[in-house]
Each structure stands twice: as C-alpha cells, then as structure tokens.
C-alpha cells in the first residue's frame, strides 16, 4: 500500500501522480477528507490510468448539529462543518471525471460502517485476482466437444484482457512433464495446493498425485 498523503494543490497532485506511477499501483482510493477542488485530483487520475475509487466516507453516521451550533464561534463551526463535507466534493469530482472520460466508482458511507470496509476489501480482492490472472500461466488440455458452442473460449481475448499466458497441451506432453517431476517437487506442490486451495477430503490421494 502506498500513501500519497494530503493532496491540496494541482502542483502536489502532479508530484503525487509521478510517485504513484513509479510504485506501479493497481488501484487508487481517493479519500475525500474534507471539501476539495477537483483540480487537486484530476492530474492524478489522468496520469496513472488505473481504477479510481472515490471514498465518499463521512466521519460519523450523522452530523451533531446541536454540538456544532453550540460552539459559539464561526471559525470553529466552519471547521466542524468542513470535517463532514465529503459529499460536497463528490459530485464535482464525478462531473469532471465524466467529462474527462475517466472511469471511477463511488463508495459512500461512514467510517465505522462495516459495509464500507467490506466494499474496500472487495475492491482489493478484485485487484489481487486481476494481478494473479496477469501473472498466470494456464494450460489447456484436449479439445472442445464438437457443436457445444456455448463453451468455446476466445483464448486470444483471454490473453490480451487479463495478460494470461496460455499453453496448449497434448496428453503426451502432459505425461512427459509429469514423469519429469521429482519427489521433492511433487511434495512441495502438494503443500502449495493445500495452502492455496480448499481440497475436498473425498479426493483420492492418487488423483492429487
């Protein structure tokens, strides 16, 4: 995770964009901590060209108007209002992104709301899945059943959409690969399977080997 810090000017936005680009980040969460001008985030979204999530997240579920009105000081009252002003900027950001052709999503809620954190985790999981697909090497064994058109796959699209490298295998090739595996390699791969996948207990040992 890379923290771009507080961005409050177009100049700092440009510098932050370069830092984020150099870190090769996969997704950008923009936390709207108070009212902000769209000019402070447009340079970032323009330059890094990755999914953008606007976090329209309030500090609490509802503003305590009695507390704010009881402060008796316009400066303090304005400060408290600005601390709850996330939703004021969100339409401005969305308008500019729409006009600029920048794709984005908006997550709305408040900090202690479980839904908000679940959604953030879902976005992170999605990025992990995309990253895994991009570094994936997938083997295809056999051929399609003639006439079963609904299962035919465009492997070229699979490659350029997700970055997956695809190996087309014949059974004789697969057997040769299997015969070349050492006992230590087999044991290590079985351990990796058990750590990364939920293996059905009904699977026979010889099938896993």
Mark where each language-model region is.
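An N-terminal assembly and electron-transfer interface module characteristic of large anaerobic redox
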Residues: 1-209
């Amino acid at each position: 995770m890379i923290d771009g810090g507080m961005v409050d000017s177009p100049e700092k936005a440009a510098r932050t964009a370069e830092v984020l680009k150099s870190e090769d980040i996969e997704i950008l969460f923009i936390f709207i901590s108070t009212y902000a001008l769209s000019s402070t985030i447009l340079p970032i979204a323009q330059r890094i060209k990755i999914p953008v999530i606007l976090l329209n997240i309030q500090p609490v579920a509802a503003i305590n108007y009695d507390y704010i009105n009881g402060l008796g000081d316009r400066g303090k009252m304005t400060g408290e209002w600005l601390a709850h002003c996330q939703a004021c900027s969100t339409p401005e950001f969305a308008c500019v992104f729409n006009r600029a052709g920048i794709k984005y999503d908006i997550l709305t809620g408040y900090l202690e709301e479980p839904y908000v954190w679940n959604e953030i985790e879902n976005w992170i999981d999605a990025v992990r899945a995309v990253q895994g697909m991009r570094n994936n090497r997938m083997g295809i064994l056999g051929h399609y059943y003639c006439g079963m058109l609904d299962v035919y796959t465009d492997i070229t699209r699979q490659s350029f959409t997700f970055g997956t490298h695809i190996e087309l295998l014949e059974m004789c090739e697969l057997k040769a690969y299997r015969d070349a595996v050492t006992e230590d390699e087999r044991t290590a791969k079985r351990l990796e399977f058990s750590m990364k996948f939920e293996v059905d207990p009904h699977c026979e040992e010889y099938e896993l080997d």
